[in-house]
Structures are given as C-alpha cells and as structure tokens.
Curated annotation (Swiss-Prot):
This is Urocanate hydratase. It comes from Mycolicibacterium smegmatis (strain ATCC 700084 / mc(2)155). Pathway: Amino-acid degradation; L-histidine degradation into L-glutamate; N-formimidoyl-L-glutamate from L-histidine: step 2/3. PROSITE patterns: UROCANASE. It is found in: Cytoplasm. One of its GO terms (biological process) is L-histidine catabolic process to glutamate and formate. InterPro entries: Urocanase (IPR055351), Urocanase-like (IPR023637), Urocanase_C (IPR035401), Urocanase_central_sf (IPR038364), Urocanase_CS (IPR023636), Urocanase_N (IPR035400), Urocanase_Rossmann-like (IPR035085), Urocanase_sf (IPR036190). Disulfide bonds: none annotated.
Amino acid sequence: MEGARPVRAPRGTTLTARSWATEAPLRMLMNNLDPENAERPDDLVVYGGTGRAARNWASFDAMVRTLTTLREDETMLVQSGKPVGVFQTHEWAPRVLIANSNLVGDWATWPEFRRLEAMGLTMYGQMTAGSWIYIGTQGIVQGTYETFAAAAEKRFGGTLAGTLTLTGGCGGMGGAQPLAVTLNGGACLIVDVDEARLRRRVEHRYLDEVADNLDDAVTKAVATRKDKRAWSVGVVGNAAEVFPELLRRGVPIDLVTDQTSAHDPLSYLPIGISVEDWEDYATKKPDEFTERAEESMAVQVRAMVEFQDAGAEVFDYGNSIRDEARKAGYDRAFEFPGFVPAYIRPQFCEGRGPFRWVALSGDPKDIHATDEAIMKLFPDDDRLQKWMRGAREKISFQGLPARICWLGYGERDKAGVLFNDLVASGKVSAPIVIGRDHLDSGSVASPYRETEAMLDGSDAIADWPLLNALTATSSGATWVSIHHGGGVGIGRSIHAGQVGVADGTELAAQKLSRLLTNDPGMGVIRHVDAGYERAEEIAAERGVRIPMREGE
C-alpha cells in the first residue's frame, strides 16, 4: 500500500499476527492512528504538535508486515519510526525495542532535528505517539486531575468549587484540562486558536461548551465561578492576546496554567499570524517564525506572572513556555513553579504514577469489568475511587476502549496480575495491554518538568531513564522505548516507556508481576538517591533494596 489511508485496529479475538505478544503492538500502533485518536492521522501525527507513530507510510507498512510474521523468540528494532532489523532473542525479551528522536548532546537542537527529519533520518516521537500507547485525551486526564486535585488541596481547601481556572491549549494533551478542573469541582476557561480542537473536545465530553466570543466566555465563566458550579467554557483566541486582556479587565482568575504546544515554537501561533497562514509561514521562514513565537510566549508568560502577582495560583504545565519566554528576554519567566515540584513529587517518591490499560477486544464491557475489579482491589484509595467514578461517567473512549489511573509501588503489580486473571477466567474477552505515559516517577530526565528542582541538583542526570528502559527490557516487557524531547521539546528531556500484555497465561502473570514491581521501583530508588525522606521510608517499608544503605 502507498500513502495515507484510514487506519483502525482490528477488534475481537481473531489474531492477525502469530501471537498476542505481537498482535498487541500491532493493534496499538494502528490504534495510535485511529481518526478518533490521532490529531492528523494522514500525516501520521498522533498528538503534541508533530508527535508521530511512524516515520512515513512505507515504514508503517513495513512494521505492520513484520509484526504479523514476528515469532515469539524474535525482536523487531525500530529506529525513529522505521523498522531496521529483526533478531532472534527469547520469550522473555521484548517483541519490539524502540528508540525515537535521540540525538547526541551538541546536536540536540530543534533546527538540527528538523534538518535531519527533512532528510528522512528521524522523527519526533513525543512520549506515547512513537511508543504506541496513546489512548486519546483520557491518557492525560488522570494526571491532570491529580495535578488540579493537589493544587486544590494546597491552596483552595481541597476543592476547586468556587474557583476559575484559566488555561491555554485544547489539543490532544491540553484538552484534558477542562474535564480535570470540573472533576475537581471548578470552573474553567480555556483558550485555543483552533475552533475545531475546541469542538472536538465538546464532542468527546472533555469540554462543556464553546463561547461565541471572549465577552460571552467571560460572562459565562465568571457566573459559573460565582455559582460554585463545575463547568468549562472554551473560546477561540490566541492565549498570548487573551491572557493579558483578561488581566487588564480584572477578571477574577484563581488558577492559571498553559498547555499550548510551546515545546516546539513552530507549533505555537504568534500574535498577528492567522491560523490559515500558520503552516506555510512556519515552513518557509522557520527562524523568523520561531523568534515571533518566542516573543508571543514572553507576552503570555508575563501575563501569567502578573496573575500570580495579583494573587492567583500559577504553575507551568511542562511545555517549556517559561524557557521560551526567557529566550525572548523576559527575566521573570521562572518566578512560577513547574507542576511536578509544586504538586506531584510526593507521589513520585512513592513510585506512584500513571497506569493505563487497553482492551484489545475493542469491547467496552471489558473495560467496565476491569473498572469494577480495580475499585474492589483498592477500596480505601479515596482519590482513586473518586477518579474511577468520574471517569466512568464522563470519559468517552477514543479508539480501543481504555482506562487510566495512578498507582504506586506495590500496587501496579497487583493490578496487572488481577487483569491477567480476568483474561484467564474469561471475564474479559481478550487480552489487556498495560502500559503508561513516559511521565512517571523514575523514567524521565527533564529539568523543566519531571525532574525540575530535584533536592540534590540532579535535574539533568539522564542515566535514570536509560536504567529504567534497561530494567523493563530485562523484566518481561512486551515493548520498550527510549525517546528524546517529549513534552518539553528537543534538547530538554530523555525518557522511557514500557508496555506489557495480560494474555491470561502463567508466563504473562510472571512477566507482569516482575515488570510492574521493578518499573515503579525505579521511581522509588531515583528519589531515594536524590535524598527524599518519603522515598527512603517507602523503600524501607516495602523492601526496596538500596545497596548504598545496606552497609549503614
């Protein structure tokens, strides 16, 4: 086959590959490009500006062809979205090993990356686009929910009721924000330059409505805040223009953040450029476009800082907008914190982070069965119980039915083995894929996001995600990935991911138990090594071996 075409993962229990160990990555690769999931499927772009599932359509076809014939003792190697080899390994080895977007340090810049990309030598994999475990906007909703819940506890008495959150960016990642705010009881006003994105989030029930204009949006959002009602309003506009205007008007904003695609300046629309002219301008004059984008980001960040000066809770949501504003000469850009040091790091110290699963059958009933099972498994986790109830009521599936929640060390392995038992007993009709975002407690080096302001100054130490990937590879993962630049952009992060498959066999149970113990265990030891007392307590309580402590 040649060129773009609609892609949808097979459903049901009939294999198109030799085993579920290869059927799973095959279906998940295709699921990433399902039109319900992908932002621009014809271009192989899944989310996050230019995050791709495959380098080109020829590479996609070659990966599909290889996965359908791959044996249970073979491993396919993928170099930036292109299959480059198959080797004989063993049944405990991953069926797929993936490396995306990785560049040597001095060459790790956007201009150099784009030059190499234009030559057909690499692609941008984001985090879950090139690692084939994207589940639509739901994939980020849980983490976003956790973040806003933590902000509510820190600043607003445990709820966002009676508050108004202002944010920008309603794409595949940012589109999670309005639902996360309303699940925490608050009102949300979200700005995006693309009306189609806003309409899509309404269709998928992540956003409640799109206002006619800014005046209409402000009126509705402020009224909702006053009534202490959970409701979200989208408005078409450029955040770099809307944020300062709302500040000028004195709109009562309680919380401010942003999830525009600021990590890649070519994916951030500067002031004064129309959506229609965007792609052509960025392609023909990338340097000039980048400079204008950074100047606009500085305007937006200035407004965010001034909202903070006025008393609002403000945080960076991990898209590098502060650093881009700094590049443009704004010297107060880092006066508000990133979301991880502000709210999430205590959970990382417990090895707690994203745990997602997908029903390969395509049957929503299988996810409903797992929902019931996981709520029974952790009956005393109030935050999880609240999340699961909200997710079941509010979240629409995109592509294959999926679910996500946050679990910690000593919990993920129990859930994985339980899901495998459900498959073995026939309570779910086909195997379950179990993975996570690369944003996790021990799988990322990202000084502007996950590892910002580490206690020991180890923000930029990138050994940890590499050790994480090596650990997953040797612990029974079905596919493992190492990426560069996800979330915050080229030159700013190294991160790893793993995916396992619950197919109901005893071998799968052994693999999942080991994999889902060791993977969050990396988060515990990473934070022990950095000197976090809570991580030290967790390691002692749960028997995580720390060699440097064993001689004490």
